[in-house]
Swiss-Prot record:
Gene: SLC2A1
Record-linked InterPro entries: Glu_transpt_1, GLUT, MFS_dom, MFS_sugar_transport-like, MFS_trans_sf, Sugar/inositol_transpt, Sugar_transporter_CS
Complex and partners: Found in a complex with ADD2, DMTN and SLC2A1. Interacts (via C-terminus cytoplasmic region) with DMTN. Interacts with SNX27; the interaction is required when endocytosed to prevent degradation in lysosomes and promote recycling to the plasma membrane. Interacts with GIPC (via PDZ domain). Interacts with STOM. Interacts with SGTA (via Gln-rich region). Interacts with BSG. Interacts with SMIM43; the interaction may promote SLC2A1-mediated glucose transport to meet the energy needs of mesendoderm differentiation.
Taxonomic lineage from the root: Eukaryota, Metazoa, Chordata, Craniata, Vertebrata
Known role: Facilitative glucose transporter, which is responsible for constitutive or basal glucose uptake. Has a very broad substrate specificity; can transport a wide range of aldoses including both pentoses and hexoses. Most important energy carrier of the brain: present at the blood-brain barrier and assures the energy-independent, facilitative transport of glucose into the brain. In association with BSG and NXNL1, promotes retinal cone survival by increasing glucose uptake into photoreceptors. Required for mesendoderm differentiation.
Protein name (database record): Solute carrier family 2, facilitated glucose transporter member 1
NCBIfam families named among the record's database cross-references: SP (TIGR00879)
Location of Phosphothreonine modifications: 478
Length: 492
């Protein structure tokens, strides 16, 4: 099949931009809790004194703070696993629109928690916005993938990750003590999430529903055709419609796909395994360990103003996501993911050497900063953006919601595990903690090389057909036959 149009219309960018506001929320709420830790802990202490007339015990304070951080991921797990309940019933766009109610409720709870002298409100607000973000990590890549032409699906899919990293960077800047990360303004820092939620409520009603959802799920061909014409800026959308109809016919021949069926069926087992491992490669790469504890890592490295070095890593994060956006359709998803994993492994080794020799060689602090920035840069080349949207590419319309739910749940669960365990593992292993991530990165590289297909330039149905046709005879084929960049349909 010839590559589809690369024309970027205003309607397409409005749709993608409106959706990506949810990605920005995810990034912001991931990064916002770190900077104001000390002032929020003091709020917990003052609240405890107000209630019980004594200072809070250090162990209780640590537990409350850990809960405040971790409850976000628990909410994310629940939200990500619930994606399929909404998108098939209400549609992709309407699901994103409805979920902003959760963002408004969370903003109110966290914004008024200090006034109400209730740390329970803050923790509940973190849980609710976690549910919102878990749903968003499923809704946004699915919607963007379904409204984008095949030739632009990778580049536009990368915008989800760009939204996340911009959100993290905004949170890092707003969290500075001189802006909102102080005793007076931290409630506003946490509740400012109502702004992108309000903006999304204004923009999304102007955006179309996914044409794939309209045609394949609702059988509304005329509406789907009208939406496609607006998105493509072209009166002739026959090829897009034919591709969707073929996928619809294939879907009708299959029974409804449940989460269990994804693992039972030979046609889905390999793609769901690839989807889960790709998500694990994102979270177990060590990137969140760098983000969660970057300030303390920079302090150990001898940086005088570690908070600004952390913001510097956020800028690198954003810059290289933009780089990925421009090269993903040329280099391909699989190639960029492999480059990213290899680069991160090399930087993790450098980071380990620098931190281990820091006391003997003070100049190693500069090497550790270079290693951290390099680690972040390589992450955004591949493992950052690609797992989000390639999951939607690996599945046809029928199993896609269930697959996105499973992959998202895997992502959030591994995120939670790293967030809870890294501090203890770091205390146990010292500067050698990143050796663990190096080993994991090498394993993910091997899996990606042998098991993950290239999806660049291929329609959803072509990719799904590759898994259906090649499932029985994979082991007889060489990696070159399986993963040639132009890809036969027997790829797995």
């Amino acid at each position: 099949m010839e590559p589809s149009s690369k024309k970027v219309t205003g309607r397409l960018m409005l749709a993608v931009g409106g959706a990506v506001l949810g990605s920005l929320q995810f990034g912001y709420n991931t990064g916002v809790i770190n900077a104001p830790q000390k002032v929020i802990e003091e709020f917990y202490n003052q609240t405890w004194i107000h209630r019980y007339g004594e200072r809070i015990l250090p162990t209780t304070l640590t537990t409350l703070w850990s809960l405040s951080v971790a409850i976000f991921s628990v909410g994310g797990m629940i939200g990500s696993f619930s994606v399929g309940l909404f998108v098939n019933r209400f549609g992709r766009r309407n699901s994103m629109l409805m979920m902003n109610l959760l963002a408004f409720v969370s903003a109110v709870l966290m914004g008024f928690s200090k006034l109400a002298k209730s740390f329970e409100m803050l923790i509940l607000g973190r849980f609710i916005i976690g549910v919102y973000c878990g749903l968003t990590t499923g809704f946004v890549p699915m919607y963007v993938g379904e409204v984008s032409p095949t030739a632009l699906r990778g580049a536009l899919g990368t915008l989800h990750q760009l939204g996340i990293v911009v959100g993290i960077l905004i949170a890092q800047v707003f969290g500075l003590d001189s802006i909102m990360g102080n005793e007076d303004l931290w409630p506003l820092l946490l509740s400012v999430i109502f702004v992108p939620a309000l903006l999304q409520c204004i923009v999304l009603p102007l955006c179309p529903e996914s044409p794939r959802f309209l045609l394949i799920n609702r059988n509304e061909e005329n509406r789907a055709k009208s939406v496609l014409k607006k998105l493509r800026g072209n009166a002739d959308v026959t090829r897009d419609l034919q591709e969707m109809k073929e996928e619809s016919r294939q879907m009708m021949r299959e029974k409804k796909v449940t989460i269990l069926e994804l693992f039972r069926s030979p046609a889905y087992r390999q793609p769901i395994l690839s989807a889960v491992v790709l998500q694990l490669s994102q979270q177990l790469s060590g990137i969140n360990a760098v983000f969660y504890y970057s300030t303390s890592i920079f302090e150990k490295a001898g940086v005088q103003q570690p908070v600004y070095a952390t913001i510097g890593s956020g800028i690198v994060n954003t810059a290289f996501t933009v780089v990925s956006l421009f090269v993903v359709e040329r280099a391909g998803r699989r190639t960029l993911h492999l480059i990213g994993l290899a680069g991160m492994a090399a930087c993790a080794v450098l980071m380990t050497i620098a931190l281990a020799l820091l006391e003997q060689l003070p100049w190693m602090s500069y090497l550790s900063i270079v290693a951290i920035f390099g680690f972040v840069a390589f992450f955004e080349v591949g493992p950052g953006p690609i797992p989000w949207f390639i999951v939607a590419e690996l599945f046809s319309q029928g199993p896609r919601p269930a697959a996105v739910a499973v992959a998202g749940f895997s992502n959030w669960t591994s995120n939670f595990i790293v967030g809870m365990c890294f501090q203890y593992v770091e205390q146990l292993c010292g500067p050698y903690v990143f050796i663990i991530f190096t080993v994991l990165l090498v394993l993910f590289f091997i899996f990606t090389y042998f098991k993950v297909p290239e999806t660049k330039g291929r329609t959803f149905d072509e990719i799904a057909s590759g898994f259906r046709q090649g499932g029985a005879s994979q082991s007889d084929k060489t990696p070159e036959e399986l993963f040639h960049p132009l890809g036969a349909d027997s790829q797995v």
